[in-house]
A protein has these predicted regions:
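A generic structural signal for well-ordered coil/turn residues at beta-strand boundaries
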Residues: 278-279, 289, 300-305, 335-337, ...
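C-terminal beta-strand edge segments of enzyme domains
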Residues: 296-312
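Conserved phosphoryl-transfer catalytic core
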Residues: 38-94
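Solvent-exposed, flexible loop/coil residues
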Residues: 6-7, 310
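Radical SAM [4Fe-4S] cluster-binding motif and immediate context
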Residues: 309-347
Length: 347
């Protein structure tokens, strides 16, 4: 959950492609873009403003201004999202007029747009303005109902250090936030529809850790028979010396590095076909002790054996292209051709 808004993170597509070669059915989802789209639409913003107004806040002038412009945001959000999805390019000139979208503090930081985009760069200029519009709404959320909110990361500060689990553990066991509720509503729909035996959560960055723990916690509370595995870049770099057993209140297994062989063996283990000592590059809890198991006789797969990444199930036409900074590289990152190369461990 919560990576880039302009494209799905490729890890799940790689794993799904591999599982296809083994005849193992799987379903994938990008909860980050789904939560973003559930929040940033007319109905979602209406509920958001209602939730904010239902409580007393000590609001700074910027948040007061955004609340005063509530109707302007609610009446323009659907068009902005469609534009950023590339489905409503015709409103670029209207956005660039600076009379269509409400503006708050994010616009104070904008560089000289004419210098940055010239007279003809209407699409990129409009994307930048629309991004600032979303940034203002994001700032309102952070100042009120959810201080951990971020568009491409969530509660990143809690996940930056793996030295201690205390702060993150306390946050996970605190009351669910407004965004948590949206996330878990969507997650529950997938669980009810798919009825999985195993849920694998990719956590590439610190800003994905909190939401993965929330999902694991929800499964343990509502569907304890479902097993939960976590893997990805964060585990590979930060959890190689894992020792805190509290982590396994949310996950059953944590795998390291290339995920294909560990997940295949894990599925066989869950199906009763392999013993726990057969697991590969895997942390789990045995008799209350965090145990790393890596004595498997089964080798990793060669590149030509991994299959083709499969993006089925991802909302490929609904990702949004944003330009946060007046920097040509940001446009290339969002709109340029992505030529995915597997160099090592899926990166």
């Amino acid at each position: 959950p919560f990576t880039q808004l302009n494209t799905p993170y490729p890890a799940t597509a790689y794993i799904k492609g591999f599982l296809n070669t083994k005849g193992i059915p799987s379903v994938q989802a990008d909860l980050g873009i789904e939560v973003t789209l559930a929040l940033f639409n007319k109905e979602g913003l209406t509920k958001l403003f209602q939730a904010i107004r239902s409580k007393e806040w000590e609001l700074n002038p910027n948040c007061q201004r955004i609340l005063a412009l509530e109707n302007n945001y609610i009446n323009t959000i659907d068009q902005v999202i469609l534009f950023l999805q590339g489905k409503l390019d015709t409103i670029a000139h209207l956005i660039c007029s600076r009379t269509f979208l409400p503006e708050a503090d994010a616009f104070d930081q904008m560089d000289d747009l004419d210098w940055a985009f010239g007279a003809m760069g209407k699409q990129d200029k409009a994307k930048h303005i629309a991004t600032m519009y979303l940034e203002d709404l994001g700032n309102l959320i952070k100042e009120t109902i959810d201080p951990y909110f971020g568009f491409s990361r969530y509660a990143e500060s809690l996940g930056r250090s793996a030295n201690s689990f205390d702060e993150l553990y306390a946050a996970i066991n605190a009351q669910q936030s407004y965004l948590d509720n949206i996330l878990l509503d969507i997650f529950e729909q997938y669980i009810q529809k798919v009825q999985p035996k195993l849920v694998c959560i990719s956590v590439p960055f610190p800003g994905n850790l909190y939401t993965s723990l929330r999902c694991g916690q929800w499964i343990k509370q509502h569907h304890p028979s479902i097993k939960v595995a976590m893997g990805g870049g964060f585990a590979n770099t930060e959890l190689r010396s894992l020792s805190d057993p509290r982590v396994f209140e949310f996950y059953d297994f944590i795998t390291l590095d290339d995920g294909e062989a560990p997940i295949e063996i894990l599925i066989d283990h869950i199906d009763g076909k392999k013993e726990v000592h057969d697991l590969k590059r895997c942390f789990t809890l045995l008799n209350g002790v965090v145990t790393y198991i890596n004595e498997s006789i089964y080798p990793d797969y060669k590149q030509h054996q991994l299959g083709t990444p499969d993006y089925e199930g991802l909302l490929l036409d609904q990702y949004i292209s944003v330009i946060e900074l007046v920097n040509p590289m940001h446009s290339l990152w969002s709109d340029g051709r992505w030529n995915k190369l597997t160099m090592a461990h899926g990166c």
